[in-house]
Structure formats: C-alpha cells, structure tokens
Amino acid sequence: MKCRGCFWLQQAAGVEFPGMPGFNLNTNTDTLLKRDLDQYRGKAAHPIFVKNKLKHLIPFEHEDLEKWTQSIHFGLSQRHFNTVHEKTNIKFGGGLDDVLLNTKTGELHIVDYKSTAQLARDKAKIKKLDEAFLLPPTNPKEPDYKASYRRQMDMYQWIMRRKGFAVSDIGYFVYVDGQHIGKKGMIDESNPNKANMEFNTAVIPYEADDSWVEKALTDAKRTLTLKNCPSHADGCENARFLADAKKALKIDMEDSQVDEYAKLMNVSGKIDYEIGES
C-alpha cells in the first residue's frame, strides 16, 4: 500500500477519488507491442529479443493468455489472472502484458510493456534505457516514479507462481521511447493525413523479489477491518487535498479542529483487490 489511509477510504469506505483520464496513446503502444509478439508466439524469439541476446526467450502460448491480460475483469474466474490468498480471503490480481518462455530452463518470464518520451532538449540529458533507468533516485528527496513498476513485477510473479507455473525471478520491461531531438515534425508531407512518431526500443531486465507480498496482503486485510480511517502517509496528495478542502470550507468544525485534522492527515502512520497504487 502506498498509503493506508487512501486504501481504507477506497476499499473499506467506498470513497472514489477523482480519476485521471486514460492514456490512450500508452494503451495503444501496449496493444501494438503485444501484436508484435503474437506473430512469434509459441514459435521463435521476436527480433527485439534476438537483438538483445535473448534468442532463447519466445512469447509464451497459453489458452488463458488473453484472460490474463484483462485487468478490468481479473476476478471473473480462476482462469483469469488472480489468486485467492487463503489467510486473508483476498482475491488478488490484475492484468499482465505478456509472458516469455525460457527454452533453456522451462521457466516463465513476466513482461511489462512501457512507453515513455524523454523531453529534455539536450541530448546529453537523455537517460539510457538500461537497468539503472529502473532504480530509485540517488537523491532520497526525489520521487521514485519507477517504484510502482518494480512492485507490480514482484506481485505478478507471485501470482503466477501461485497459479502453478515455474517463474524466473528475472522479468523484462520492454520500453518504447518517443523521439523528438533532431526531428522536424511528425506529419507526412507526402500524405498530410498521416503522421508518424519514431521510438527507440529497449529490453530491460529486472530481478524481482516477491517476498514482501504476503505480508502486504495481511497488512491490507488488517487495514480493511479498522473502524476508522488510519493516518495517511507522509506527503500523500489526497490527504493534503482533503485537509485543505476541510480548512477552506470549515464544515462543522472549529478552527482548532481544522488545524488538528490537517495535521493528522499528513502524518504517516472474500475481498477483491486489484493491483494498484493506493
């Protein structure tokens, strides 16, 4: 859980926080990348893996693969991408992007597609898409935007193992990085009804660790059973918004109570559960 307070509000109290609009371009790149791998599924390594000296990895063919990718419907059946944690009775799941079969070991590797665009104008400031790209920032005050990527890979490996598969600790992030440096534009002058964006590609290995997942589910169940909302994490944006709104509106509260509430909101401190960032 990124924030126990937000998790409780969403899962126990049914509070819906303002949503973000969908990123259709990102979704479309995921769709196209899967189609790339579908052409080689169960047969041979895709050229992107051959280029990265991973020709022993081929797209995994399984009758339930399409169900595994359906994040919205992850809990519909046991054939979807979920598992029930018996100790907490939490059905835990989501939608994965793809799976590779290691023809040398027989193990599976979880694959996560990612699309990005580095907007720095100075080419020297463009980060290389390698293992260091996924690491936490060296400055602890900087936000760790890749933490959710790493956690998701950890969780998906845990689920896949509980579904009875032999899964390697090594997962792969397949990145496409939209280019702009040195580009005049994207509209095709010979056919102005068309536009093109060029992407650089990368395959980044990540050694996952799912040892924390079961404890996190136990903590989640304990949080769900609380009668009152627990404290929010330090720096929680939702907590700050709620506290500021209460303070601005002063709804049925004295100033001293509002100040105390604002302070409180910013201090750390069978159920279906989709993998997310609450």
Each language-model region and where it sits:
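Mg2+/Mn2+-dependent nuclease catalytic core
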Residues: L76-K215
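Serine-centered coil/turn micro-motif
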Residues: M20, H46-P47, E142-A147, G235-A239
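Non-catalytic, well-ordered alpha-helical scaffold segments
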Residues: T31-R35, D154, D234
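Short N-terminal secondary-structure initiator segments
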Residues: A44-T69, E107-E142, A262, S268-E274
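Amphipathic alpha-helical segments that form well-ordered structural scaffolds
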Residues: D36-Q39, M155, I159, D219
